[in-house]
Amino acid sequence: MRDRPVTLAAITGAHGVAGEVRLKLFGEGVAALKRYRAFNDSGDGSGLTVVKIKDDGKGGAIARFAEVPDRTAAEKLRGTALTVRRSELPSLPEGEYYHADLIGLPAVSTEGEMLGECIAVENFGAGDVIEIRKADGKKFMVPMKTEAVPEWTDERIVIEAAYADQ
């Protein structure tokens, strides 16, 4: 597991005059964010310390950070991604994955052919789909289902050869 930052939410703007911000969530809702006391902590004191986070009733959240004293400071944070280190995320059961764990992994076929690198994980409603970029720059997508991706580890993604010949 690579211990790089994983984005859980993004600040979309200010909320009110007291320095609260609106958040767009990329995970499992407000409850998943509440387990973290700080975001973007790179060890240099530039992180954001959580004072409170609440559901906004619209699929997002409202947050208050100790370092954001007023609306002006909150507005300057628009577009800021809220990240945590991968090692801070909860462990997952066998067969589950975080999208961040797949991105950047090499992809090989079941026949051992190097296919490229996973550059994205999308979900268009019918389940996750991984996007692979070949060495020549061309891209193809594969459903993240057992028949198409029989195996993945921290080191690689194995794609059924029939799905790689697209």
Curated annotation (Swiss-Prot):
Residues 94-166 form the PRC barrel domain. It is found in: Cytoplasm. Keywords: Chaperone, Cytoplasm, Ribosome biogenesis, rRNA processing. Pfam families: PRC_RimM, RimM. SUPFAM superfamilies: PRC-barrel domain, Translation proteins. GO terms for cellular component: cytoplasm; ribosome. GO terms for molecular function: ribosome binding. InterPro entries: PRC_barrel-like_sf, PRC_RimM, RimM, RimM_N, RimM_N_sf, Transl_B-barrel_sf. GO terms for biological process: ribosomal small subunit biogenesis; rRNA processing. Belongs to the RimM family. The PRC barrel domain binds ribosomal protein uS19. An accessory protein needed during the final step in the assembly of 30S ribosomal subunit, possibly for assembly of the head region. Essential for efficient processing of 16S rRNA. May be needed both before and after RbfA during the maturation of 16S rRNA. It has affinity for free ribosomal 30S subunits but not for 70S ribosomes. HAMAP family: Ribosome_mat_RimM. Binds ribosomal protein uS19. This is Ribosome maturation factor RimM. It comes from Novosphingobium aromaticivorans (strain ATCC 700278 / DSM 12444 / CCUG 56034 / CIP 105152 / NBRC 16084 / F199). The gene is rimM.
